[in-house]
Amino acid sequence: MARLPAGIRFIISFSRDQWYRAFIFILTFLLYASFHLSRKPISIVKGELHKYCTAWDEADVRFSSQNRKSGSAAPHQLPDNETDCGWAPFDKNNYQQLLGALDYSFLCAYAVGMYLSGIIGERLPIRYYLTFGMLASGAFTALFGLGYFYNIHSFGFYVVTQVINGLVQTTGWPSVVTCLGNWFGKGRRGLIMGVWNSHTSVGNILGSLIAGYWVSTCWGLSFVVPGAIVAAMGIVCFLFLIEHPNDVRCSSTLVTHSKGYENGTNRLRLQKQILKSEKNKPLDPEMQCLLLSDGKGSIHPNHVVILPGDGGSGTAAISFTGALKIPGVIEFSLCLLFAKLVSYTFLFWLPLYITNVDHLDAKKAGELSTLFDVGGIFGGILAGVISDRLEKRASTCGLMLLLAAPTLYIFSTVSKMGLEATIAMLLLSGALVSGPYTLITTAVSADLGTHKSLKGNAHALSTVTAIIDGTGSVGAALGPLLAGLLSPSGWSNVFYMLMFADACALLFLIRLIHKELSCPGSATGDQVPFKEQ
């Protein structure tokens, strides 16, 4: 019998379950990358909405304006839909506040909507919910760009568009994390989700390149094209997304991976049915250490989360307060608030900062800003690998936050020395800023949302994810707004604000870091059995 072709041998070397998981991994990666792709254009177009005008440019503009009034031909004439140094109403001296308000409108709506999104999403099929969000997001992203073609100069139009877009985009994150959590267990979760979460940076890079291609010639297309891409991916989602392995008769890894230790984020694994069969088994020492309120054997009642169930079906939706009682949710949520403040300030203001400091045009500044996201890809993967190896999520985040603050100070100083220095600091800053943000929004959220007391309840995963990312989105809304208010007084003040935010993020993890470092390893130490009450 002839030997099978190499390609066929490769295909059959993997099981049916593995192929399905790879498909879901890639599909959810592309779906959320398209969300981020649609968020990036506003930061690229800022440099075009208010152009960097030199004294010669302003004199040229006045000369052409006088020629138009006298009826003579002008050697340089601006289009009718542009004014002196940009697009009204962003051509005035208060342009930074107006641009900051656009960011705040989107991000504030996103933060508020995220809390509601988890509650709504856990009661609707993920595929339908996500499809609706992507189609609506594509429509409102494109609507912003239509302001260029229809010569719209109403500030209210752009604000309302941003608000609605922010609300509908909240359908994305809880949905894709829940879907991925259904398909992948806890083994090597930091690495898997670190690689998967690079969709954030990939989406930002693609968004920068696509928006930058048209920003100087027809900035409306910088929004219309990404909007069309998101809508198209929404159709792909509707046609191909599989919410749970059981839907295609695949095994669920959430059931098979039952290792006592998960990651040191203080989770109590309790459920009545499990207690009946395992009540004589000892707790993992680190879990025990994280759950002891005074270190003497007493367990805080608020750390016990027991869901009503029907013998383990895992279909009951956890309440908002119930999710908050899961140890670690509040601390990581508040940490993410400040970590996301830093990340989104760079997302929305970095191209304009490069334009002002290095005096590059909007297209080149947008292309250069992608290096921050390239660094973010490596930072997210590195954080996942380290946290998997050390089995300490909070400590990994804390170390990167500790290094990020002085790096931002160096960035603010070195970036003024030339293009080469800017490139190096963009890569390093991107890695350190995005690492903790990536780890918390993916591996930590999935760990907390699938702790054993919930018995793999995807509804709970959606709620926990929404709480953590929703709290982080409050910081994402504040960061760009504060940057818009502080930047007129000097970019150095913006960087001081970012360094302070990193310090605050680290502060909220101190208790968890102390618990992780003071606990014995997972294979040693005294073990205390937990008795059913």
Curated annotation (Swiss-Prot):
The source's superkingdom equals: Eukaryota
Question: Any idea which GO molecular function terms this record carries?
Answer: glucose 6-phosphate:phosphate antiporter activity
Q: Which residues cross the membrane?
A: 18-38, 100-120, 129-149, 157-177, 222-242, 304-324, 334-354, 366-386, 394-414, 423-443, 466-486, 490-510
Q: What is this protein called?
A: Glucose-6-phosphate exchanger SLC37A1
Q: What is the lineage of its organism?
A: Eukaryota, Metazoa, Chordata, Craniata, Vertebrata
> Known InterPro entries for this protein?
MFS, MFS_dom, MFS_trans_sf, SLC37A1_2, Sugar_P_transporter
| SUPFAM superfamilies named among the record's database cross-references | MFS general substrate transporter (SSF103473)
Q: Which Cys-Cys disulphide bridges does the record give?
A: none
| Name of the gene | SLC37A1
